[in-house]
Amino acid sequence: MEESQRYLQLERSQQHDFLYPLIFQEYIYAFAYDRGFSRSSLSENPSYNNKSSLLIVKRLITRMYQQNHFIIYYPNDSNQNTFWARRNNLYSPIISEGFAFIVEIPFSLGLIYCLEGKNKKIVKSQNLRSIHSIFPFLEDNFSHLNFVLDILIPQPVHVEILVQTLRCRVKDASSLHLLRFFLNEYCNSKSLITPQKASSSFSKKNKRLFLFLYNSHLCEYESIFVFLRTKSSHLRSTSLGVLLERIYFYGKIERVVNIFVKVKDFQANLRLVKEPCMHYIRYQRKSILASKGTSLFMNKWKSYLVAFWQWHFSQWFHPRRIYINHISNHSLEFLGYLSNVRMNPSVVRSQIIENSFLINNAIKKVDTLIPIIPLIAAXXKAKFXNVLGHPIXKSVRADLSDFNIIDRFGRICRNLSHYYSGSSKKKSLYRIKYILRLSCARTLARKHKSTVRTFLKRLGSEFLEEFLMSEEDVLFFTFPKASSTLWGVYRSRIWYLDIISINDLANHKSKL
């Protein structure tokens, strides 16, 4: 018990109690605005780039010093005499981005301290940032497992949950009060997630702050897995120690486990959920917990997670958000792929002197397939096809040139081929590419008030192929003599290490 308490105790040198005064410093906003340092999505917003001048920041800080005028308010009636009424669109992203940068400081320093304190070198793992790095992991491990928990992580339904989650790591009460005031006044209600309009508006205008709060919320949730994994494994992971450096964490976990099994011995309770062969994967709100254990063991974990969310986050976690599935007869939908484990039969002939034997072996293999029905639905939502998958023409601006139209369709097609290059069967990918190519042809024919056949006959089919050429086709044209060798590469799965976000069509969103 004492060893665990020392392991989970927050170091004195990592307690930062003076974050609030940084809000009044001009250089903080300069750091937050710098693209190379922050890499914030707000820096990509062209409407905000022209408004973040040093003069505006100075005026903002001057008004913030005037206590009578420092009122953050988001009313529908803009006639009220408030600090935010006239300059809502101007000051809101500046303060939110600066505040998000400030509260990230303890986390960044904590990570550096954790690595340097253990004589570790900070290694840039660029390849592990790729989404495709997850699938080789699935291929290596999931074929030996039995059950999987398919978990949909609930969103925080109250702003106080986000503030309390951040309070576990940040001890500056003034900054937390400002954050609470900022969230409550912006949403104009007690709920952040329940009103969809308020949540959507907040996440779009304050992307950096929203992502930081949501990631802190998920980090709090995932810390229990790191804790149990550390306690149940002899090869303890030290690189994730920063996730456990929080206030009162041990007491909360002990209380949750005691509630779960209603026994006072914490170590005895911990053995009930120990499993050395357990794997955890998460992307956004979707998480997977796979184990080699039995169905009873997975039901214990399901009950444990429900109790953890209800007592630790004070919110209802519906048991139907967690599905227990057997890996061998269930297709797992994750990151736009359908992954399942199938038996790959093979016949081996063995001959001993005059006798020969035929041995049938069945090897488990992880297949990654393309979900064609959701992709066709996404293409129909983006106006590339109808609900049956028949290509249709898109309405485009009259001032767009043919080259720009073809370039847009070609970029979408190449990105889709790039993302689904790891599919075991690419027939579905060919169908989606066919929909995009014919939709592009019909869009151009509609623009020129002609038919598709007449348009292609006039320009030639090579005109489209030049821009819609996939990466595999480039290999064949570049190395024609090695076509037989490249054909095997073309049919095999290829995982790329430069994909940092899920494809729009794969994510079933119409952002195109």
Swiss-Prot record:
Subcellular location: Plastid, Chloroplast
Disulfide bonds listed in the record: none
Keywords from the UniProt entry: Chloroplast, mRNA processing, Plastid, RNA-binding, tRNA processing
InterPro entries: Domain_X (IPR024937), Maturase_MatK (IPR002866), Maturase_MatK_N (IPR024942)
Repeat is among the record's keywords: no
One of the record's GO cellular component terms: chloroplast
Task of the protein: Usually encoded in the trnK tRNA gene intron. Probably assists in splicing its own and other chloroplast group II introns.
Family classification: Belongs to the intron maturase 2 family. MatK subfamily.
Protein name: Maturase K
Gene transcribed to yield this protein: matK
